[in-house]
A protein has these predicted regions:
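Conserved glycine-rich Rossmann-like NAD(P)H-binding loop of the short-chain dehydrogenase/reductase
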Residues: 24-46
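Rossmann-fold cofactor-recognition segment
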Residues: 50-72
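Catalytic loop of short-chain dehydrogenase/reductase
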Residues: 100-102, 107-120, 125, 135-206
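C-terminal helical subdomain
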Residues: 214, 227-272
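Rossmann-fold scaffold of SDR-type NAD(P)-dependent oxidoreductases
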Residues: 9, 88-102, 123, 165, ...
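Short beta-loop-alpha junction of Rossmann-like oxidoreductase domains
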Residues: 174, 216-229
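N-terminal Rossmann NAD(P)H-binding glycine-rich loop of SDR-like oxidoreductase domains
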Residues: 8-12, 16-21
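Conserved Rossmann-fold cofactor-binding substructure of NAD(P)-dependent oxidoreductases
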Residues: 67-90
Length: 272
C-alpha cells in the first residue's frame, strides 16, 4: 500500500502560505512546500508560527527552493521529493501549482512585452514545468492507495489523487464581458487549457487514480489583488485563510466526473 504526501508550490506568502498552514492543521500527511527564498528555514518557521503543536508538526514539513522561471530549480526539487518519498512506497496525493502575478493592462497600448512575457512564464509556464517534473509522482492505476487517517479533520479522497492548477475566472473566454487585463487573462486561459490536457494524459496513464483540475479562488486579500480591494462587493473579498479553507473543501470533495474542468470556491464550474 502506497503512502500519501502533499506538494504546494509556492508557499511563502498569500494563498499558498495559508493553504500550507491549513493542511498542516487539518491533515497529518507530510507536506513538501516550495519557496523562491534562499532561506528555506525562514519559510518553514513562518509556516509553523503559532500553529498548535508546531514542534510535533515540524518533522512532516519539508521546504524546497523553486523559481518556476528556472527549470533547473524545479528539477532539483523533484529529485529531493523522490529522496523523501520514494515511488515504491509513496505517491503524490495532492499537488497545488499556484504561482501567480498580475500586470493589469486596461488597453492594448499599456501592454509591456517584457512584463507580458514574465506573466506567461510565471502564470502558465510555471504550472507547466511543475507538471513536467512532479506529475509522474501521482499514483498509477495499479497503485493501492493508503487511506487518509480517520482522525484527520480534512478527509482527502481515498480513491484518487488530485493535481490542481491555479486559474482565475478572468481566464474564461466565454465569460469575458469586460475585456482588459490582456496578459493575465490569456495566461490564465492557458492554465485552464493545460489543466484539461494534463487530465486527459492522467486519464490514459493513471485511470481514475489521478485527476487534474483548474481552480478559481475568488478575490483574495493578497498583494496580487491589493489595488482592487475597494472595488470588490461586500462578502466577496476573502482573507487568505478563508480562501484556503474553501479551496481545501473543494479539493477534498472533487468527484471523478468533475475531472479536467475549472471549479470555483463555490464548487461551481467556470466554463472555458
Amino acid at each position: 500500500m502506497s503512502s500519501p504526501w502533499i506538494f504546494i508550490s509556492p508557499s511563502s506568502r498569500g494563498i499558498g502560505h495559508a493553504l500550507t498552514r491549513h493542511l498542516l492543521r487539518t491533515t497529518s500527511l507530510p507536506i513538501l512546500a516550495s519557496t523562491r527564498s534562499s532561506d528555506p528555514a525562514s519559510t518553514k518557521s513562518s509556516l509553523l508560527k503559532d500553529l498548535p503543536q508546531a514542534e510535533d508538526i515540524a518533522p512532516r514539513l519539508s521546504i524546497v527552493q523553486i523559481d518556476v522561471t528556472d527549470e533547473s530549480s524545479v528539477a532539483a526539487a523533484a529529485d529531493r521529493a523522490r529522496e523523501l518519498f520514494p515511488s515504491k512506497t509513496h505517491h503524490l496525493r495532492l499537488a497545488c501549482a499556484i504561482p501567480g502575478m498580475l500586470f493589469p493592462e486596461k488597453n492594448p497600448k499599456q501592454i509591456d512585452m517584457e512584463k507580458a512575457l514574465q506573466t506567461f512564464q510565471v502564470n502558465t509556464l510555471g504550472p507547466l514545468v511543475l507538471m513536467k517534473h512532479f506529475a509522474e509522482m501521482l499514483p498509477k492505476q495499479s497503485v493501492e492507495l493508503e487511506p487518509s487517517p480517520k482522525d484527520d479533520q480534512l478527509q482527502l479522497s481515498n480513491s484518487h489523487a488530485l493535481w490542481l492548477n491555479m486559474a482565475a475566472r478572468v481566464g474564461s473566454t466565454s465569460d469575458n464581458r469586460a475585456g482588459g487585463w490582456y496578459s493575465y487573462r490569456a495566461s490564465k486561459a492557458g492554465v485552464i487549457s493545460l489543466s484539461k490536457s494534463l487530465d486527459r494524459y492522467l486519464a490514459a496513464r493513471n485511470g481514475e487514480k489521478a485527476l487534474a483540475m483548474a481552480y478559481h479562488p475568488g478575490t483574495v486579500k493578497t498583494g496580487l489583488s491589493k489595488d482592487f480591494w475597494d472595488s470588490v462587493e461586500d462578502g466577496k473579498l476573502f482573507s487568505p485563510e478563508d480562501a484556503a479553507a474553501k479551496m481545501a473543501s473543494v479539493m477534498a470533495g472533487l468527484k471523478v466526473d468533475q475531472r479536467g474542468k475549472c471549479w470555483d470556491w463555490k464548487n461551481e464550474e467556470v466554463l472555458p
